[in-house]
Each structure stands twice: as C-alpha cells, then as structure tokens.
C-alpha cells in the first residue's frame, strides 16, 4: 500500500516522524449537533488530530476524520464508539443510510509509514476494546475481516439494525466476531475494519425522481457489475434526487470517470447532475481542478478539504483547549 503523504507536518509541530493512521468513524446521528459534538469531544486524545467532521440530516449520519499515531487513534476511536453507545438509541430512530450501530462503521486507513495489514491489527484491537468497555459487539470487515464473506461491508450490514437484531438470534452465521451473540439493545453493533483511502461523493440532480436515481445506483455499483470500487445508493435529499457514493479505488476509477458515467446515465432519464459534494477529505492526487465534477462541488475549500493541507493544519477540538 503506497502512502498518501510522505511527510506529515502538524500545526505547532515540526514533524511527525512515526507512522500516521487515519480513522473515519461514521455515527448514526445527523440531526442533533449537541449530541454529535459530545461524541467528537470524547475522541480527543493526545497524539490525535481532528481533520474533519460533518453532519448529514438527510441520511441521519455524521462522519468524523481523525489522524495520528496508531495507539492514540485506536484509543480515540474506542472512546467515540462508547460515547455514541451512551447517546444514540437506535430503537428511537430510523436510518436512511444503512446502519447496524450507533457507532456504525469505524475504518482504519494507512496514511504514512504503516501498511494496510497493520491497520487491520489496529482494527482488531479497537474491536476488542469496544466490546470490553461498552459491551457493543463488533463485526470485523475489509482487510480486518475474520471471514471472507465479511470483507464486504454491505454483507455485514445486511438487514440493518432491525433485521440483524433478529438474525443473530436465529442464525449463528450472522453473529458478531467479537462479543455478542446478541446486539446491544440500543446501540446495536459496530463494524470495525481496515481499508484503503475512500472518497464519499454525492451528486444531486435537477429532479426529485427517486426511482431514476436508484436505477443509476444499480447500474454503477461494482456489486452489480458497474464501476470498479464504487458503492452507490439513491435517495431523496433536500427535495432532490441524490446519488450517494463511496469510491474505494481512486486509481482504477477516478472521480472524473464516475461523473461522466453518471451524467450519461442521467441523460437517458432526461435529468442532469447539478451539484456535487465530498463528505470528508479528498487526497491531492484525486483533484482534477479543471474537471466538470470539481466545478460542481459546493462547500469545497481546498485549505480544509484536501487531506494533505488539513494534516498540516488540523481543526480545534470542540469544547475548547
């Protein structure tokens, strides 16, 4: 696994000579800013830098990005998962985005001086700690998967919280890798894994036709024989059809290729993409500044949304110094 950054310099520090790991927890809460802020604040650990966090009310989901030395990042992720288990009750909400837990997905990503296989070990350590501290069972996925069928995150989340809660009782093959056998009554389970860098990219259309955008999602997702390394779902967000995608292979499937394919498919339905957004951070190598897809991005500030620049100037943690 090649590194995204060879030298990582943090604000107020000359350099970070050791390995750098990124972690991008996804929490099943996107409407309550105080609750999400408390989860983010709980993740503050010496040696960990806050790179990005955002809330998405349409998907009822928040995404946090942190980076730092491996041991500290593991501790940060575990604290965030346990705080989420305290504050989020899945029995009182419905997730628009597929989810199985309050702290739904916690991936570890190699940035500098560390390999994907080592990140898989960190994921397993984090999973053990999450179960030990807050009794939320864990499914291991991606490069950390304990079983081949669980390398695919979609398979792990099949049925969502409501369906999985029943499945683990009836089917031993659906039970967690760590803890259990049942789910936490209100916080569900947590998928913890290791993966390469991923870009979350959403496209909005000049249409409210959900059937149309779901048809496009089926055609482009890798699982249906579409674009390599693409996961996609179609939803109605803010009164518009939205294609929500995870791009897991930026070298094999650059974002310009995704945008062209989506545009061609939309034209068949007499629709056009009118706006795009990146959730989280984008590596410098993925930027194509003269491309149509980048011109359509909203809220994209290169100083805050490009990984390498954010690593050099991390955010202040909520709650003050």
Show the residue positions of the predicted features.
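Long, contiguous binding/interaction regions
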Residues: 17-321
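Cysteine-centered motifs
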Residues: 3-5
């Amino acid at each position: 696994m090649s590194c995204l950054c060879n030298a990582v310099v943090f604000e107020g520090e000359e350099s970070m000579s050791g390995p750098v790991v990124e972690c991008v927890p996804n929490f099943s809460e996107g409407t309550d800013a105080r609750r999400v802020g408390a989860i983010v604040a709980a993740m503050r650990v010496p040696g960990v830098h806050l790179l990005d966090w955002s809330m998405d009310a349409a998907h009822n989901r928040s995404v946090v990005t942190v980076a730092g030395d491996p041991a500290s990042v593991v501790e940060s992720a575990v604290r965030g998962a346990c705080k989420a288990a305290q504050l989020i009750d899945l029995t009182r909400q419905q997730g628009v985005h597929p989810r199985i837990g309050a702290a739904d997905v916690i991936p570890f990503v190699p940035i500098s001086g560390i390999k994907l296989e080592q990140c898989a070990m960190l994921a397993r350590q984090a999973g053990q700690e999450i179960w030990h501290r807050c009794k939320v069972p864990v499914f291991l996925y991606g490069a950390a998967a304990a079983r081949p069928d669980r390398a695919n995150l979609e398979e792990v989340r099949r049925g969502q919280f409501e369906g999985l809660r029943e499945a683990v009782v009836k089917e031993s093959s659906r039970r967690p890798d760590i803890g259990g056998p049942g789910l936490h009554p209100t916080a569900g389970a947590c998928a913890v894994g290791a993966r390469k860098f991923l870009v979350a990219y959403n496209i909005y259309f000049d249409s409210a036709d959900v059937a149309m955008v779901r048809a496009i999602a089926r055609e482009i997702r890798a699982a249906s024989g579409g674009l390599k390394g693409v996961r996609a779902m179609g939803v109605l967000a803010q009164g518009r059809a939205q294609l929500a995608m995870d791009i897991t292979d930026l070298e094999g499937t650059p974002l310009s290729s995704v945008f062209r394919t989506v545009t061609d498919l939309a034209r068949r339905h007499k629709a056009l993409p009118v706006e795009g957004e990146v959730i989280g951070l984008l590596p410098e190598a993925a930027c194509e500044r003269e491309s149509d897809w980048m011109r359509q991005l909203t809220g994209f500030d290169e100083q805050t949304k490009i990984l390498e620049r954010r690593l050099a100037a991390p955010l202040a943690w909520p709650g003050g110094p």
